[in-house]
Regions:
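Gly/Pro-rich hinge or "lid" segments in bacterial periplasmic/extracellular proteins
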Residues: 66-67, 163-220, 225, 233, ...
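Append "and occasionally in soluble cytosolic enzymes with long acidic Gly/Pro-rich linkers
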Residues: 207-212, 263, 289-379, 383-384, ...
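Ligand-site clamp/hinge motif
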Residues: 213-259, 387
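Surface-exposed binding/hinge segments that line
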Residues: 5-7, 92, 127-174, 199
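N-terminal lobe/hinge region of extracytoplasmic solute-binding protein
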Residues: 33-84, 115, 190-192
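Periplasmic binding protein-like
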Residues: 32, 102, 247-248, 253, ...
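Extracytoplasmic/peripheral linker and loop segments enriched in polar/acidic and small residues
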Residues: 293, 387-399, 428-496
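Long beta-strand-rich cores associated with HINT superfamily self-processing modules
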Residues: 493-520
Length: 520
């Protein structure tokens, strides 16, 4: 028989005291049910709200939009200066910021990041490439980076947060065939954000744990692990919130689902004013939609009040122009189109183009409001005498379709969210012909006068000049019926009742998790 060695009594007592006095802290976990898939983790490959959680939680930029109304705050940069001619922006990086592998964040990483964005020609590249040319950004020293613009741009600072900084040395290790590490970064992490990736499956979502070494000090309470999971159906997300399987989900649910969540004892609804326009883009380049009278007929065929007031219960505000009502640049005298079948038929009678085929109306899988809107549009068009064919896609797939006039549906309904708080985020990116190839510009609208006005607004730093130019451009776009603008939304964010620290911003929709914690 063998005997284990007996521990002396004092040591046993010491072990008991240590184990009872210092228990390991419980790990806190948060699961967000997202409407659309995370098909890539590359922060430079996507520029939409559906995948914003990746950019906000795994990565940092020089500045960040915070709170509501949104304010631009220093982030990786501690300060910046602008040259008198408005062309050179010089940023001083804060000391102590590190990537998830421990490497220091330097000016060279910032320079590499903007060059990578411009080279990949994805995500925010369509916007940034109008202001910055390749090989013009300089790392003056380890903590100073300078951007030289091709021309003065009033929105440059507003879009600086979209320059998400990646670990240049790490990506260079994973480059293949000069791809800037794109294949590797699709499913990996090269950031410095508040959370670091632990697991990723494009069919499911991603999991990340708290990065204790983040440059921004953590408070006494925080969430240790976050998961952003694809859950396609509204009803499944709502039921999961009620059961406690999920602790957060998107804040733009149908009114009946919001009502269900309000009645759940373990859920709270965070209400916030927002800037998010729901609209149909009309493919202006495809016959017969290249006839303005056909487009006006479509605009008169949608039952705005029936959708906004009856289906959505008055939880949104009619927005008849391509700029949110609660922002400057809006022509207040423009009332837009109303639901009027007689006027729709009159416009159709004036059209030179004949509508001799069904019109395809696209909507987004997992976003039931878009299906409801597509159905309302189809019903209205049927009363005018036009046939339709409804088609749906997951958001990333629809984005790809909307990049070309040949593949985009005749009409497609979705939201234009806030990526930066400036009218250019809406009318400039939707209706300047230089933006073709992006999902925002899927109307494929081209009007030289509108391009000229939008260029004036983009270059000027005088708010009065910009306001006047945006108003005039909006009047023309509405008269041309380039799209169908339905409403400006309000955010009704479902969160677990015991969650605190939620900092909603219309830029990101409250999906930045570093301040969030469980109250008990």
């Amino acid at each position: 028989m063998t005997h284990g060695r007996a521990w002396p009594i004092p040591i046993l007592l010491l072990v008991v005291v240590v184990l009872t006095a210092a228990p390991a802290p419980a790990q806190t976990r948060f699961v967000f049910a997202n409407e659309s898939p995370y098909d890539t983790l590359d922060p430079h490959a996507a520029f939409d709200v559906g995948r914003v959680a990746v950019r906000l939680n795994l990565y940092d930029g020089l500045y960040r939009w915070l709170d509501n109304p949104a304010k631009l705050e220093p982030w990786l940069a501690e300060s910046h200066t602008v040259s008198p001619d408005g062309l050179r922006y010089t940023f001083k990086l804060r000391k102590g910021a590190r990537f998830h592998d421990g490497a220091e964040v330097t000016a060279e990483d910032v320079r590499y990041s903007i060059e990578r964005i411009l080279a990949l020609k994805k995500g925010a590249a369509a916007l940034l490439s109008t202001m910055i040319a390749p090989d013009t950004t300089k790392a003056l020293d380890r903590s100073t980076v300078q951007f030289t613009l091709t021309k003065p741009a009033s929105i440059f600072m507003a879009v600086v947060p979209e320059v998400h900084v990646v670990n240049a040395a790490l990506l260079k290790q994973h480059e293949k065939d000069n791809d800037w590490g794109a294949a590797w970064l699709t499913s990996n992490d090269a950031g410095s954000g508040s959370y670091m990736l632990t697991r990723y499956d494009p069919a499911i979502g991603f999991i990340a744990r708290r990065f204790a070494g983040h440059f921004l000090p953590w408070g006494p309470k925080y969430i240790d692990e976050i998961e952003f999971r694809l859950v396609k159906e509204d009803n499944t997300r709502v039921l999961g919130m009620i059961k406690g399987d999920y602790q957060g989900t998107g804040g733009y649910l149908p009114n009946d689902q919001v009502k269900r969540l309000r009645e759940a004892p373990n859920v709270k609804i965070v209400e916030q004013e927002s800037m998010r326009i729901m609209m149909f883009q009309i493919n202006n380049q495809r016959p017969p939609l290249n006839d303005v009278h056909v487009r006006r007929a479509i605009s008169y065929a949608f039952d705005y009040d029936g959708f906004n007031k009856d289906i959505l219960g008055g939880s949104v505000e009619r927005n008849p122009v391509p700029i949110p009502n609660n922002l400057w640049g809006v022509p207040r005298d423009v009332k837009g189109y109303t639901y009027n079948i007689d006027k729709a038929k009159q416009e159709l009678a004036q059209a030179q183009a004949k509508v001799d085929r069904p019109l395809t109306v696209g909507y987004l899988q997992g976003f039931s409001q878009t299906e409801q809107a597509a159905t309302v549009m189809a019903n209205g068009l049927r009363k005018v005498g036009l046939d339709t064919r409804l088609t749906s896609e997951l958001w990333p797939n629809m984005v790809e379709r909307m990049k070309k006039p040949e593949t985009s549906p005749d009409l497609v309904v979705y939201w234009i969210s806030t990526y930066y708080a400036d009218p250019n985020n809406w009318i400039g990116e939707m209706f300047h012909s230089g933006q073709w190839g992006t999902f925002k510009a899927s109307s494929f609208y081209k009007n030289p006068k509108v391009d000229e006005l939008l260029d004036v607004a983009l270059k000027s730093t005088d708010r009065k000049v910009r306001d006047k130019a945006y108003q005039e451009a909006a009047r023309i776009v509405v008269d041309d019926a380039a799209g169908v603008w339905i409403y400006n939304t309000k955010y009704f964010g479902p969160w677990a009742k015991n969650l605190e620290g939620i900092r909603f911003s219309p830029i990101g929709n409250g999906q930045e998790m570093r301040w969030v914690y469980y109250a008990k």
